[in-house]
């Protein structure tokens, strides 16, 4: 898996193992289709007795583990058609830099904030954890503070550098995100990383931790900045939503909504990134429940504030030859707008 540069390995009955390479799922044809006995033996080979017992109770198990000199891995073991199956993701030991990920300088500025809420969003497999890991590593090298992470499971390991780093894993070091966040303020943190804002209690805790003067990072499975804001507010009952809009408008420092796309020659993947920086005008729009107007503010805030919409990011990658037109159009949240951007550029090119 690691030698072939695969991001994921899938093990299930009736198929040879399959590797995800640059987004495509490729069967390892040198192996025969796996039997139920094969998949159970392979998946159980990495489990402790305690983990085996928990899996047999729940039929689901999240975990992470490392192989010395090879890589760390995140795994999900599950049942399908009465047989054991597993999905494994490779987590490199080396943490990548902002430049290696293609993150703009404005993201580094978010890592320098003394307090507030920074959200990294996107679909599964879009690199949210990798982006957050790079941000946390930058803070770890640049600041002298206390970082607490709550993850399910722990993926990247952060050694103590200039910061003190405590990493807590759900179901190993704490019962749940909710329980960990209930006590986090008593642990004297400066920076808090929440692996995923899954429910009302976790979202409320993230807002409270941010509001009390801590820099807080979290992820959500949303595709755009505006959708992220709506998701946070809509989780709460109607009578609380006005209060949450006000609270969010004060604590929010940035939203990074990302996608990983195959590059133009299909030899790797590149990052497309929507960036929202809450200017005073955008904070007012959040408070006044005018979320639909935020997109226009982002379009005009690119040069001055470092913001960009997903279409602006896709267009930039396309004009640089990093992705194809078809990929850009297929991944655009507003394809008609993207087509007009390309047509406008063609007209301007002809006039020159």
Across the structure, where does each feature detected by a protein language model lie?
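Short, flexible helix-loop junctions that flank or precede catalytic/ligand sites
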Residues: 1-352
């Amino acid at each position: 898996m690691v030698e072939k540069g695969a991001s994921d390995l899938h093990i299930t009955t009736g198929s040879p193992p399959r590797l995800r390479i640059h987004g495509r799922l490729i069967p390892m044809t040198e192996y025969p289709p796996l039997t139920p006995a094969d998949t159970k033996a392979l998946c159980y080979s990495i489990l402790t007795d305690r983990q085996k017992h928990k899996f047999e109770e729940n039929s689901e198990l999240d975990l992470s583990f490392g192989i010395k000199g090879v890589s760390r891995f995140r795994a999900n073991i599950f049942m399908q058609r009465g047989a054991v199956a597993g999905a494994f993701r490779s987590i490199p030991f080396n943490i990548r830099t902002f430049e290696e990920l293609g993150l703009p300088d404005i993201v580094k500025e978010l890592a320098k904030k003394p307090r507030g809420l920074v959200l990294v969003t996107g679909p599964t497999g879009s690199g949210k954890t990798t982006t957050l890991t790079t941000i946390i590593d930058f803070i770890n090298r640049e600041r002298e503070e206390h970082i607490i992470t709550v993850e399910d499971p722990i993926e990247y390991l952060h050694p103590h550098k200039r910061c003190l780093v405590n990493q807590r894993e759900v179901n190993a070091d704490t019962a749940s995100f909710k329980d960990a966040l209930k006590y986090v303020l008593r642990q004297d943190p400066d920076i808090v990383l929440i692996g995923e804002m899954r429910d009302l209690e976790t979202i409320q805790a993230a807002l409270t931790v941010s509001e009390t003067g801590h820099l807080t990072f979290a992820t959500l499975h949303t595709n755009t900045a505006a959708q992220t804001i709506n998701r946070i507010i809509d989780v709460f009952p109607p009578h609380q939503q006005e209060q949450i809009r006000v609270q969010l408008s004060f604590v929010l420092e940035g939203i990074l909504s990302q996608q990983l796309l195959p590059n133009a020659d299909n030899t790797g993947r590149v990052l497309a990134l929507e960036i929202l920086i809450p200017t005073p005008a955008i904070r007012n729009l959040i408070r006044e429940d005018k979320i639909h107007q935020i997109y226009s503010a982002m379009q005009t805030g690119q040069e001055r504030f470092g913001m960009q919409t997903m279409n602006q990011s896709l267009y930039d990658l396309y004009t640089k030859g990093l992705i194809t037109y078809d990929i850009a159009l297929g991944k655009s949240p507003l394809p008609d707008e993207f087509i007009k951007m390309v047509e406008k550029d063609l007209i301007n090119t002809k006039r020159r």
